[in-house]
C-alpha cells in the first residue's frame, strides 16, 4: 500500500506531521506526493527518508484537467489529480490535516475490485441535500474525500480527473463542495464504505458531545460513535480544528500527540524514535 498526498507548499508543515504519524504506525511501500510543478516539498521527502521509505514526487502536468478551472478553485482538485496513479497498486490518499494513531493492516486486505475500486467513510450524519441532488442511495451515502483507499487500475477504469472536472463545471449548481460532490456523483454505487474510525471528523470528537449529531434521535449513526472512538485509526482535523487553533483545555490525547510530532519536525531523523500513539498514551 502506498501513502498518497496532494498539496502545495502552504500545507507542507501539516503534511509533515501527517506523514510522520502514518509512517510511525504502518509500513508503506512508498510515499507519493502530488504538487504543482514548482512546489517540490523537500521537508516531506526528508521525513519519509528518515523512515527509510522511498518518495515519488509527481508534479501536476500543465495539461492537467484542473487547469480548466479558475485558479482559486484548482487547489481543491489536487486530490482528484492524485487519484490518477499509473503504477498499479493500492493507495491510501489522505489530506494533510489527518493524523494516524493506529495500525492500518486491515486496509491492506480489504477487497477492492472493478465493482468497488474505492473505499471511503460516510460523513456519519445525514446529508439529505447531497443525496437528493447527487442521486445517492441514502442521506448517509455521501463520503468525505479526506481519506480514500483505492486500487489504481480499477479506479482508472471507472473515473478520470478529466471526468471529475467536467462534472464539477457542468453541474456547478449541484456541487456545493466542489470536487467532493463531483467525485461522489461519479462513483456512487461503486464505493465500499469504511467505518468512521478511519476518518474521524471534528464533529465526531468526544469533546463535541453536545453536538446535535451525537444524539441518536437526530442521527441514527450516532450510536456507532463509542465504537469509533474505541477503534480509532485516523483523525481528521476537519473544519479548521487543528490542535494549534483549539484551546488547550479542549485538547484530547490525539491533539497532544499531534503537537508532540509537530514540535519534533525540526529534526526529521529523530521521528522514527518517537513513540506510537498507543505507547505514548500509557
What is each PLM-predicted segment?
Residues 1-11, 64-68:
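Glycine-rich phosphate-binding "P-loop"
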Residues 21-29:
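Short, acidic, metal-binding catalytic loop of nucleotide-sugar glycosyltransferases
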Residues 31-37, 120:
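Short internal beta-strands
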Residues 4-7, 17, 152-282:
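A glycosyltransferase accessory/donor-loop signature
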Residues 69, 132-138, 220-224:
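Short, P/G- and charge-enriched loop/turn segments at secondary-structure junctions
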Residues 59, 75-127, 149-150:
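GT-A fold catalytic core of metal-dependent nucleotide-sugar glycosyltransferases
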Residues 40-86:
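Active-site-proximal specificity loops/subdomain of glycosyltransferases
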Residues 136-147:
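A recurrent flexible, glycine/aromatic-enriched loop bordering the glycosyltransferase active site
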Amino acid at each position: 500500500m502506498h501513502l498518497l498526498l496532494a498539496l502545495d507548499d502552504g500545507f507542507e508543515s501539516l503534511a509533515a506531521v501527517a506523514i510522520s504519524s502514518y509512517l510511525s504506525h504502518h509500513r508503506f511501500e512508498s510515499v507519493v506526493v502530488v504538487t504543482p510543478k514548482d512546489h517540490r516539498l523537500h521537508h516531506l521527502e526528508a521525513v519519509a527518508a528518515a523512515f527509510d521509505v522511498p518518495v515519488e514526487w509527481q508534479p501536476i502536468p500543465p495539461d492537467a484537467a484542473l487547469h480548466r478551472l479558475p485558479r482559486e478553485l484548482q487547489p481543491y482538485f489536487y486530490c482528484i489529480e492524485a487519484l490518477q496513479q499509473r503504477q498499479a497498486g493500492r493507495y491510501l490518499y489522505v489530506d494533510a490535516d489527518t493524523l494516524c494513531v493506529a495500525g492500518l493492516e486491515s486496509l491492506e486486505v480489504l477487497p477492492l475490485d472493478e465493482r468497488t475500486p474505492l473505499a471511503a467513510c460516510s460523513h456519519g450524519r445525514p446529508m439529505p441535500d447531497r443525496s437528493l441532488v447527487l442521486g445517492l442511495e441514502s442521506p448517509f451515502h455521501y463520503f468525505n474525500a479526506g481519506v480514500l483507499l483505492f486500487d489504481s487500475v480499477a479506479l482508472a477504469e471507472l473515473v478520470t480527473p478529466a471526468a471529475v472536472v467536467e462534472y464539477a463545471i457542468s453541474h456547478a449548481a449541484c456541487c456545493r463542495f466542489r470536487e467532493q460532490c463531483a467525485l461522489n456523483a461519479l462513483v456512487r454505487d461503486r464505493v465500499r464504505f469504511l467505518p468512521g474510525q478511519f476518518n474521524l471528523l471534528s464533529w465526531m470528537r468526544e469533546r463535541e458531545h453536545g453536538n446535535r449529531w451525537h444524539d441518536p434521535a437526530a442521527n441514527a449513526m450516532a450510536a456507532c460513535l463509542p465504537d469509533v472512538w474505541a477503534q480509532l485509526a485516523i483523525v481528521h482535523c476537519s473544519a479548521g480544528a487543528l490542535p494549534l487553533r483549539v484551546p488547550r483545555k479542549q485538547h484530547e490525547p490525539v491533539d497532544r500527540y499531534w503537537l508532540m510530532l509537530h514540535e519534533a519536525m525540526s529534526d526529521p531523523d529523530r521521528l522514527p524514535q518517537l513513540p506510537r500513539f498507543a505507547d505514548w498514551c500509557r
